[in-house]
Amino acid sequence: MHAFAPEFGRVAKSYKWPIAKGQTSNLRLLMHRFLRRISIRILSFALAVGCLSATSYGQATSAVIAVDHGPNAQQQLSKHYVILVSLDGFRYDYAKRYHADHLLTLAAQGANAPEGMLPAYPSITFPNHYTIVTGLYPEHHGIVANTFYDPARKEEYSNRDAKSVGDGTWYGGTPLWVLAEQQGMRSACFFWVGSEADIQEVRPSYYLKFDGKFPNGKRVDQVLAWLHLSPEQRPHLITLYFSDADTAGHQYGPDSSQVADAVHELDGEIGRLMDGIKETKLPVDLIVLADHGMVKVEGAAIRLDQYGLNPSWFAQIVDSILYPKSDDDAQRAYEALRGKSDKFLVYRRAQVPGYLHFDSNPREGDPVVVPTGPYLITASGDSRGAEHPPVGMHGYDATRMPEMKALFVAAGPDIRSGVAMMPFENVNVYPLIAKILGLDITNLKTGPIDGKLGVLEGILKSD
């Protein structure tokens, strides 16, 4: 309740007891106003942390963690709202292919990328979610894989490890919620990579620790509950995450009935969200996108140790990311793998093609192995997935495999209607959202971003 303590302590006028007869009506009015103010603050707090039902859509959740950043600054109260929704693994063509009516309606009402949005390399979940909210390529923000090793720290980061996920020192860049909070604007994250961490000593005003079993409907309920907070407490930036399409794609492949079912389930939740937004009558821009696509895996897993790779050359191996003990060992590994198969390319890290933006961060390993097709590559038979590879996979170069391209649709008061965009890189989403929210990104503490506003500025309505 810290956010509301100043309100409780505010005194409009002092009275001495006993109260004179003429003062009674004034005191009653003041007490009425004071109690009403307290009630509104308590209601706002209850909705924020999930104690009460906000709308007819259901209950908010008690799992929300509220951080006391104070109310929205005065200059932020008139700003519009952005809800950023990620459908993990939702390939660019799923909506049309599986008749996701609500997403297709959203696309028709606003802007969309019919041929998809290009994920950063590697096209996997943690790097791309964090790229979307920082405007930086993975090698610049540091989250280069779901699991990786940092040679300087001599530590491993893993999306399966709560300690590293919540450690803000792993994360570079300035995430959108940090940007918002630093400029006096409240934010909320219903799951997003980095949102549990103390990045630049800042967390969202409202966030949750990841729980993959959390019901989708309750996620939407909580987002709508946030929109029903008082203007002072209401977040202007909200993120929302769903994993269903990715899970089904891995287990059954992108052509399966299970993926179709997941698409329909998610589309239903998007429809509920659209209806709920409309009911609020707030100026909300809804952006629904994905981190990457999905492709069916071909053949058995490719083991690099069968091509002469010697584990003794490495200080650490994480899946197929190789961390050599020395530069000489990196060169030995490169020479052992070079030209051995047409199913992968191998580069010394500094020689990785520039368009991949994967050539300067020690966390990326050295040498770097890049698949040429939908193959699962592991360092050895002990690597995760070597024995029983998934049916569907991602992580590949989107310029080689268009199946890696992701969904992007956006609609709302700031988005032009009927706009179809050519494929664009997802680093450009960050400056678009900052522009809609009126947030300044010209002098970030972490330096300039990789994304460019000019790429997507054309989908915005003229001021």
Spans of features found by a protein language model:
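Bacterial N-terminal signal peptides that target proteins for export
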Residues: H32-L43
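A long, amphipathic alpha-helix that forms part
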Residues: Q76-L77, N216-H228, A245-L286, I433
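Active-site neighborhoods of enzymes that stabilize oxyanions during catalysis
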Residues: I317-K435
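His/Asp/Glu-rich, glycine-adjacent segments
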Residues: L136-G253, D342
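Active-site nucleophile/metal-coordination loop of metallo-enzymes that catalyze phosphate/sulfate
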Residues: Q59-K79, Y92-Q182, D198-I199
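Bacterial N-terminal signal peptides
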Residues: R41-A54
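Metal-dependent active-site segment of extracytoplasmic phospho-/sulfohydrolases and closely related
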Residues: L84, H102, E265-R303
